[in-house]
Amino acid sequence: MDAGAAFPGLLWRFLPALIETLNIAAVATILGGLGAMVFAFLGASNLNVWPPVVPVARRIMDVMRAFPELIFALFLIFVLGSSPIPAMIAVAFHTVGALGKQFSEVNENIDTRAVEGLGACGASWFQRMRFAVLPQVLPNYLSYFMLRFEINVRASAILGFVGAGGIGSELRRTIGWGQGAGDETAALFVLLIFAIFLIDQASSWMRQRIAQTEALT
């Protein structure tokens, strides 16, 4: 069969591996984003959090952000075995620190008058966060979340090289075969680049929509 005619079949064949990588990145980003929100509220100095908690939350985020995903994934693969789970945990762990830092900075730049107003009316801390803080920070949270998802797709693909599954594992296999696996390697790169391009375009479009919405309010 002609190599050009077989290439679309290779794309279809490796599509499940790409979907697995996207699933790893999506779950890791969601879990990491939820954890980041918790640490972001605990690490913001202007949200009436118990003062000793603020520096502790910030240092924890610093450690999580600085810890290399690859090293953590290798350790988890040694403990849990080769599967997508170690990659998901490693990426989510790093995401908590990275997004937590960004979310915390967003929190510290809010207009606190609404928070103070609700406090004067007797609202609890959770009510103030829900009704005065979240409406202000969610647009920026979403923008950072989409950008982090794009980064995590690349990270998940790289972790596949060390046995974490997904498209990275297929790339490792085809590259290891050497001569004769060029078409398969090319198909995997095309799928990965196309997926990252689509995510980047969707992320850019969403950030533009958020910016336009904020400009109108």
Q: What does each of the following model-derived ranges do?
A:
Residues 1-28:
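Periplasmic/extracellular loop-to-transmembrane helix junction in inner-membrane transport proteins
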Residues 143, 186-217:
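C-terminal transmembrane helix and the adjacent membrane-cytosol boundary/short C-terminal tail
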Residues 38-73, 102-105:
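Cytoplasmic-entry segments and transmembrane alpha-helices of multi-pass inner-membrane transporters
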Residues 13-16, 20, 55-65, 105-120, ...:
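Short amphipathic alpha-helical coupling elements at transmembrane boundaries
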Residues 16-24, 68-98, 184, 188:
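Loop-to-helix entry region at the N-terminal start of transmembrane alpha-helices
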Residues 25, 29-37, 41, 45, ...:
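Hydrophobic positions within alpha-helical transmembrane segments of bacterial inner-membrane proteins
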Residues 20, 24, 160, 173-200:
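Pore-lining and gate-forming transmembrane alpha-helices of multi-pass membrane transport proteins
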Residues 82-133, 139-148, 201-204:
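Membrane-cytosol interface at the C-terminal ends of specific transmembrane alpha-helices
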